[in-house]
Amino acid sequence: MLWVGRRAPAALEELAAKYAKRLSRHLPLAEVRVRPAAGRQGDARRALAEEAAAVRKHLRPGDTLVVLDERGRERTTEQLAGWLAERRRLGRTVFVIGSDLGLDSSLKNEADELFALSRMTLSHGLARLLLLEQLYRATDLLAGGQYHRGSLG
Protein backbone atom coordinates (compact mmCIF):
# COMPACT_ATOMS: atom_id res chain seq x y z
CA MET A 1 0.00 0.00 0.00
CA LEU A 2 1.39 3.37 -1.03
CA TRP A 3 -0.03 6.57 0.37
CA VAL A 4 0.98 10.16 -0.25
CA GLY A 5 0.88 12.55 2.66
CA ARG A 6 1.93 13.39 6.14
CA ARG A 7 1.28 11.16 9.10
CA ALA A 8 -2.32 11.05 10.26
CA PRO A 9 -3.38 12.05 13.78
CA ALA A 10 -2.18 9.63 16.47
CA ALA A 11 -5.58 8.00 16.97
CA LEU A 12 -5.84 7.10 13.27
CA GLU A 13 -2.23 5.89 13.17
CA GLU A 14 -2.86 3.64 16.18
CA LEU A 15 -5.94 2.07 14.60
CA ALA A 16 -4.20 1.69 11.24
CA ALA A 17 -1.30 -0.12 12.93
CA LYS A 18 -3.79 -2.44 14.67
CA TYR A 19 -5.44 -3.44 11.39
CA ALA A 20 -2.13 -3.68 9.53
CA LYS A 21 -0.89 -6.15 12.17
CA ARG A 22 -4.09 -8.20 11.91
CA LEU A 23 -4.00 -8.11 8.12
CA SER A 24 -0.39 -9.30 8.01
CA ARG A 25 -1.56 -12.62 9.51
CA HIS A 26 -3.50 -13.27 6.29
CA LEU A 27 -1.34 -11.73 3.58
CA PRO A 28 2.00 -9.99 3.15
CA LEU A 29 1.61 -6.26 3.66
CA ALA A 30 4.06 -3.46 3.02
CA GLU A 31 3.06 0.13 3.63
CA VAL A 32 5.06 2.97 2.14
CA ARG A 33 4.39 6.61 2.87
CA VAL A 34 5.38 8.88 -0.01
CA ARG A 35 6.19 12.40 1.08
CA PRO A 36 4.10 15.15 -0.47
CA ALA A 37 5.91 17.33 -3.01
CA ALA A 38 7.57 20.49 -1.71
CA GLY A 39 6.08 23.85 -2.69
CA ARG A 40 2.65 22.35 -3.26
CA GLN A 41 0.66 25.56 -2.75
CA GLY A 42 2.14 27.35 -5.76
CA ASP A 43 1.69 24.76 -8.48
CA ALA A 44 -0.65 21.87 -7.77
CA ARG A 45 -0.15 20.30 -11.21
CA ARG A 46 3.61 20.13 -10.75
CA ALA A 47 3.18 18.77 -7.22
CA LEU A 48 0.83 16.02 -8.43
CA ALA A 49 3.27 15.07 -11.21
CA GLU A 50 6.15 14.87 -8.69
CA GLU A 51 4.08 12.77 -6.31
CA ALA A 52 3.08 10.42 -9.15
CA ALA A 53 6.76 10.01 -10.09
CA ALA A 54 7.58 9.19 -6.46
CA VAL A 55 4.79 6.58 -6.38
CA ARG A 56 6.02 4.99 -9.64
CA LYS A 57 9.46 4.40 -8.07
CA HIS A 58 7.82 1.79 -5.84
CA LEU A 59 6.01 -0.08 -8.62
CA ARG A 60 7.35 -3.21 -10.30
CA PRO A 61 6.57 -4.67 -13.71
CA GLY A 62 3.57 -6.96 -13.39
CA ASP A 63 2.08 -5.18 -10.38
CA THR A 64 -1.66 -4.69 -10.38
CA LEU A 65 -2.11 -0.98 -9.71
CA VAL A 66 -5.28 -0.10 -7.81
CA VAL A 67 -5.87 3.60 -7.25
CA LEU A 68 -8.35 4.75 -4.63
CA ASP A 69 -10.73 7.29 -6.13
CA GLU A 70 -14.27 8.25 -5.19
CA ARG A 71 -15.31 7.69 -8.82
CA GLY A 72 -13.95 4.14 -8.79
CA ARG A 73 -15.74 0.84 -8.45
CA GLU A 74 -17.41 0.12 -5.13
CA ARG A 75 -17.63 -3.42 -3.74
CA THR A 76 -19.34 -5.17 -0.88
CA THR A 77 -17.09 -6.94 1.62
CA GLU A 78 -17.97 -10.28 0.04
CA GLN A 79 -17.14 -8.96 -3.45
CA LEU A 80 -13.85 -7.56 -2.16
CA ALA A 81 -13.00 -10.95 -0.62
CA GLY A 82 -13.63 -12.73 -3.93
CA TRP A 83 -11.62 -10.14 -5.83
CA LEU A 84 -8.71 -10.47 -3.36
CA ALA A 85 -8.74 -14.25 -3.66
CA GLU A 86 -8.34 -13.89 -7.43
CA ARG A 87 -5.67 -11.17 -7.14
CA ARG A 88 -3.57 -13.29 -4.76
CA ARG A 89 -3.22 -15.91 -7.49
CA LEU A 90 -2.16 -13.33 -10.06
CA GLY A 91 0.65 -11.55 -8.20
CA ARG A 92 1.34 -8.39 -6.26
CA THR A 93 -1.41 -5.80 -5.90
CA VAL A 94 -0.50 -2.24 -4.99
CA PHE A 95 -3.13 0.10 -3.58
CA VAL A 96 -2.38 3.82 -3.93
CA ILE A 97 -3.97 6.57 -1.84
CA GLY A 98 -3.45 10.15 -2.97
CA SER A 99 -2.59 13.25 -1.00
CA ASP A 100 -4.95 16.07 -0.10
CA LEU A 101 -4.47 17.24 -3.71
CA GLY A 102 -5.51 13.83 -5.01
CA LEU A 103 -3.47 11.91 -7.60
CA ASP A 104 -2.14 12.92 -10.97
CA SER A 105 -4.49 11.92 -13.78
CA SER A 106 -1.66 10.03 -15.51
CA LEU A 107 -1.43 7.65 -12.54
CA LYS A 108 -5.19 7.14 -12.58
CA ASN A 109 -5.02 6.40 -16.31
CA GLU A 110 -2.25 3.83 -15.74
CA ALA A 111 -4.22 2.08 -12.99
CA ASP A 112 -5.57 -1.38 -13.61
CA GLU A 113 -8.52 -0.37 -11.49
CA LEU A 114 -10.02 2.64 -9.74
CA PHE A 115 -11.43 1.52 -6.40
CA ALA A 116 -13.84 3.52 -4.23
CA LEU A 117 -14.24 3.08 -0.50
CA SER A 118 -17.01 5.67 -0.68
CA ARG A 119 -18.36 8.31 -3.05
CA MET A 120 -17.29 10.88 -0.47
CA THR A 121 -13.85 12.46 -0.44
CA LEU A 122 -11.84 11.12 2.50
CA SER A 123 -8.60 12.29 4.08
CA HIS A 124 -5.69 10.01 3.18
CA GLY A 125 -5.37 8.97 6.83
CA LEU A 126 -9.00 7.93 7.07
CA ALA A 127 -8.92 6.26 3.63
CA ARG A 128 -5.86 4.27 4.70
CA LEU A 129 -7.56 3.15 7.92
CA LEU A 130 -10.75 2.15 6.10
CA LEU A 131 -8.81 0.27 3.43
CA LEU A 132 -6.77 -1.64 6.02
CA GLU A 133 -9.90 -2.54 7.97
CA GLN A 134 -11.76 -3.71 4.86
CA LEU A 135 -8.77 -5.71 3.60
CA TYR A 136 -8.52 -7.37 7.01
CA ARG A 137 -12.26 -8.04 7.07
CA ALA A 138 -12.16 -9.57 3.56
CA THR A 139 -9.09 -11.74 4.23
CA ASP A 140 -10.51 -12.92 7.55
CA LEU A 141 -13.71 -13.85 5.73
CA LEU A 142 -11.66 -15.87 3.22
CA ALA A 143 -9.86 -17.59 6.11
CA GLY A 144 -13.16 -18.56 7.74
CA GLY A 145 -12.70 -16.16 10.65
CA GLN A 146 -15.44 -14.62 12.73
CA TYR A 147 -14.64 -10.89 12.31
CA HIS A 148 -17.12 -10.34 9.47
CA ARG A 149 -20.65 -11.16 10.44
CA GLY A 150 -22.34 -9.80 7.31
CA SER A 151 -25.89 -8.61 7.18
CA LEU A 152 -28.07 -9.81 10.01
CA GLY A 153 -31.27 -8.54 8.39
Residue ranges and their predicted role:
Residues 18-19, 82-85, 112-113:
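Glycine-rich, phosphate-binding/catalytic loops in enzymes
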Residues 13-16, 77-78, 108, 128:
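Conserved strand-to-helix beginnings and helix N-cap segments that scaffold or border functional pockets
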Residues 35-37, 71, 120:
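Short, solvent-exposed coil/turn elements at secondary-structure transition points
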Residues 7, 74, 100, 104, ...:
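Gly/Ser/Thr-rich beta-alpha loop segments that engage phosphate groups in nucleotides
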Residues 1, 66, 98, 131:
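Conserved RecA-like P-loop NTPase ATPase core
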Residues 105-153:
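Structured adenosyl-cofactor binding patch, chiefly the S-adenosyl-L-methionine
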Residues 39-94, 101-108:
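Portal/gating segments that form or line small-molecule/metal binding sites
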Residues 1-65, 140:
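RNA substrate-binding interface of SAM-dependent RNA methyltransferases
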